[in-house]
């Protein structure tokens, strides 16, 4: 069980929900991509009362030092009220940090109002070696149309 909060473009933080599942928005997958260990296994290890401190310490990589790079994902929600197809922006798919996406073609043309700050139609995944480039890349996705 964990709370989820969302930060808007103007820096305001809003409560989203209390979720009864592992942390959302692919956080564990992003951690695994950056550090190369399974965060789901780690969560079971740290909650197991029989785990020793040595086992826990030996499982985790060293923070920052052992990272292979920077992993990020962007939650896509259409910027238009009416869409007919998925069209991946050239700026996204040709960027060297682009890895994959989970977006699918729209099933209806009218885009409903967002029901929550975390509502998205799918995720786009990135991985690279420069945190500033990653930050700027993720921010730039806000201005692109994935659904037209």
Question: How would you name each of these model-derived features?
Answer:
Residues 1-11:
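Internal nucleotide-binding/catalytic subdomain
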Residues 1-2, 19-81:
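Active-site "cap" helix and flanking loop/linker of ATP-utilizing ligase/carboxylase catalytic domains
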Residues 8, 65-69, 115-119:
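A structural signal for short secondary-structure junctions
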Residues 14-17:
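Protein kinase-like catalytic core scaffold
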Residues 60-64, 89-91, 109-115:
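Short proline/glycine-enriched turn/loop segments at secondary-structure junctions
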Residues 76-107:
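Glycine-rich active-site loop/lid that clamps phosphate-bearing ligands
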Residues 103-148:
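Generic C-terminus detector
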């Amino acid at each position: 069980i964990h709370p989820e909060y969302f930060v808007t473009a103007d820096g305001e933080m809003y409560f989203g929900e209390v979720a009864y599942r592992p942390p959302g928005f692919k956080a564990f997958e992003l951690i695994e991509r950056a550090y190369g260990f399974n965060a789901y296994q780690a969560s079971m290890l740290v909650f197991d009362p029989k785990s020793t401190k040595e086992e826990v310490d030996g499982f985790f990589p060293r923070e920052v030092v052992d990272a292979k790079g920077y992993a990020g994902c962007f939650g896509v929600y259409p910027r238009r009220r009416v869409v007919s197809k998925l069209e991946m922006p050239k700026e996204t798919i040709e960027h060297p940090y682009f890895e994959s996406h989970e977006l699918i073609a729209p099933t209806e043309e009218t885009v409903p109002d967002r029901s929550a700050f975390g509502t998205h139609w799918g995720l786009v995944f990135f991985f690279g070696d420069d945190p500033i480039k990653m930050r700027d890349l993720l921010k730039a996705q806000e201005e692109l149309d994935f659904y037209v």
